[in-house]
Each structure stands twice: as structure tokens, then as C-alpha cells.
Amino acid sequence: MCILLKNGKIYDGTGADAFIGDILVDGERILDVGTGLATEADEVIDLDGLSISSGFFDAHSHNDWFAVKKEPLKYLEPFIRQGITSFITGNCGLSAVGFEPDSPYAEKAGAGLFGYHGDTTGVYPTVKEFFEAVDRNNPCNMAILVGHCTARTSVAGWENRPLTEEERKRMLAILEQGLQEGACGLSLGMMYLPGRFADVAETRDVALLAEKYDRPLTVHPRAESAVSLDYPIFGRAHILRALDELVEMSRGTHMKLQYSHAIFVGRSTFKCKEELHRILDEMKANGIDAQFDIYNELLGVSVITVFIPNWFQELSPKDKRKPWNQWRFTILGELSMKMLGFGWKDIQIAYLGPGLEQYEGKTVHQIAKEWGKSCMSAYLDLCEMSGFKGRVNMGPYSTPEIIAWQSKRDDVLYMTDAWVEEHGIQNPAIYDCFPKFIRCSLRGEGDTMPHTIRKMTGGVADRFSIPDRGYIRPGCFADLTVFDEAEMASAVPDQEKPFGIRRVFINGKEVLKDGVLDKEALKTSGHALRSR
């Protein structure tokens, strides 16, 4: 089918100024771009007053775990509605691919956060198998990183020990196979099991492998806060110690380092922002291709036990209630929150379990006040009510000023780091992340519009070596997002819907028009994105 989109304000993904022009789409690809294109087309769409760019490209996603569902649209619909057509998945070391099919630890892939649970189309140990599944049944385009946590789990489970030489070779072979099959890079999750057990020598092996194939290594650092459980409590801020570890890992290489979701967890961490970027800049000066990515929410999603140390979780219910353990837990918990710069008003219940929906959306402080008890006691009760498996939204992880400052840097990409939860309150980034970046740009609070668009289109495709994506030019695939700048600039933020996204095309198929999804087209509109 031939479609002519006329008179649109075109952002071509290069960072150049927008221009008024026409785009001719033939089948899956862009055939021509120019002004006054005179040609016969099956459909002519007048974009007068509207803007158009390549479909938005989420630079940091975990939607590989949801792309394998039998009905993936349920999980991807909110992203499509905010103009996203493509994803870089497999982040934080937690990829859905990268394990030996006969591994006794295969079910541990995902570190307990994700997994092949529920109604999936199958289990896909390799990148090749995952890509074949995406091409059969997916609404969106999916690139994937191979996760170190997944590969390490495959050969050694979650054991806290150095790998044997044989295990090391098997792990690296898994990662290399993924790169050879078109993975767009590798990923580390140094805060997750079993990535947290890897030393610098092990992560350096992974970095050198990514460098060999000229692909990025994305890194969830060991700490993103001023204090954590991973380093001695006093001295240099832990977020900076974690970055020091990456400096040591990359020393002497020319690797592509992608520092994931540059956040500053807790008010006590905000002061580290300049030093973090000074270190990244120093790495660049020493030959490391260092970049980072951000989302624009002030909160993050965490397990409800985020402030409960392992020793307390391992106690029996009876021992948890012993006065000495209660006192020790309370003192250490309050101290850690104070050192981080969190308060009980900052922790919102997102999900506890069936029949406990009345607590969703309330803060621990609110619930404690309703119950007439201390916040720490109420928090412990909430943990127990959820079986220590609840979920919270908490912050601050940043400020509007920090986000605006980071969003203007040349070495940043934009992303959501969000996924659809089965129950409870959702992360607002699934609804309104990329439109918010545009809204901030239009209001003078972010980068310029051409650069904003580049950081969510062509810049992402370039970084991860995805050919023929991210740009509006002849020969590129016709992933297109049409948006109304006037509506976006004046919109009142709504956490459950984006504003101003008028049309979305994925590989030449119009899948969203004025808020209505074409669910039939979306069954097979997406493609696997192989890196080259």
C-alpha cells in the first residue's frame, strides 16, 4: 500500500531543524521525502499543523519478557499510545534470552523480577529463537541485549562465588552466540542476582566481548544511592564507588559503555550528580565511548522489602516479633532511610495482594496515621500482609531540575524503564514518558525539539547499530509518529494517558489513529531488530 503524508512538520532524527514536507510510504519503507511530492497514492493524509518523526525508540526496556506473551498487545498498548514503536530490551543483565536450554537453573532467569510466567508462546533460550517469535507475533519492533545475569545464572545459578574457568568460558560463549545472532549489545545488572557476585575481572571479560563486536555494554550499577548494602557505610558515596568500579572495568579498552537510568536515589544522593558526570566525561577523554540514559519520572518501582535487611527477612514470623529483633530492625531501618534522604511520605503502596486494594495509592505515613501506630511498625505490618512480596512506588530518585539538566547533555538517550504490571498501581512512565520529554522541550524546560526527537529516534538506532530505523529518509522503515505540538505544550499532565499523539505507523501499517488502535494490524506489525 502506498501512503502519502503531506504538509507535516518533519523531524528527521538527525537533530537538524524541522521542515515542512511530504513523506511517501510504499509498503514497509519510506520511498521518498520532500516538498510538493506529486504522486498517485492509495491514501493521502494531510498533516497540516501536525508534526511527524520516526517512531519513538525506547532506549532501555524490559519488554522482552512481555513480547513473548500470547497476547503481547495488553502489555505494549500504553507504549504505542505514547508513540513508541521500538524497544531496546534485555537490560540490567536480566534478558529473556541467553541461557542453555538444558540448564537446571533456567527457571531462575530474570532474577525473580521477571520470568517465563503465565501465558507465553514458549521459552526462547537464544536470540535467534526470540527474534523468530517476535517476527511471528508482536505489535512492536524489538531489539535485545544479552544479559550477563541470565548467562551467569545458566552456568552457576545464584551461587555467591567466582566462576570456574569452565563456567566462565560457557558464560562468555552464551553471550557471544547472542551477539553473533544479532543482539544489539550486552547488559550488566550489578545490583541483581547473580550479577552482584561478579568481580571486576569477570565484568571486564564481558566488556571486552562487547567491544570485540563494537556493541554497547549497558550497565545497571552496583549502587545508585549515597549509601547501600554493597560498600562500607562511611566514606565515598556509594553511587560514585559503583562508578569507580566501571572505570576500573573499562580501563585500557575503547568500549561503548551505556550507563543505565542515571538516577540519584534519595535526597542525600542529589549532590553526587556533578561528580557522576565528571567521571563519565573523564572516561570519554580516556577513550571510552560513555553515554547514559534517563527517564523523566521522579519515582521508581521497588519491592516492598527495600528497607528490610536480609537477616530480618530470614527470621521466622515468631522471631520477627521478638523485642530485640524489632528494636534492631527499627533502629537500622530508620537510620538507613535518614542517610538516604527518604521519609515515610515518600513510599506509596502500589500492590500488596488480592483483597488489599484499599491500601493502593496510600503512603506508609497515611496508613500508619489511620492505624494509630508508628510508621516503622505499620511498614512491617504491610510487608507481612503482602507475604513480603508487595510492591511500592518510591522517590525521589531525581528532581525536575536534575532531569532538565541531564536531558540537555549531548551524551544522553531517553527511555522509560517501565513495564505493565498485572495488578496494582502502574508506573506512570508507561503512559506519558516520551510525550513528557516533548512537553518539557516545548515549554523551554528541556532540550531543543530537534535534539529531543533525536534522543528518542535516530540517536538510539545509531547507538545500538540498528540499521534503517530512527530516521525519516528514503529506504528507512516507515515507523512514524504523528503528534500535535500545540496540544502537547498546553496539556495538563495525566498519569494514565498521553496527550497529542495523533497517529502511529509501525513498518508502514497505521496502528493508531486519533486514539483508536487497529488491533488486527497490530498482531503482526512488529519486527525483530537485528544489530549490524
Regions found by a protein language model. Give the residues of each.
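Active-site mouth loops of central-metabolism enzymes
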Residues: A59-K70, A156-K169, G195-F197, P232-A237
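Histidine-rich, glycine-flanked metal-binding segment
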Residues: M1-L4, I10-G55, L73, S490
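C-terminal cap of metal-dependent C-N hydrolases
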Residues: P317-Q326, T330, E334, A404-D411, ...
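Active-site neighborhoods of metal-dependent hydrolases
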Residues: V134, P139-E165, A173-Y192, I233-R236, ...
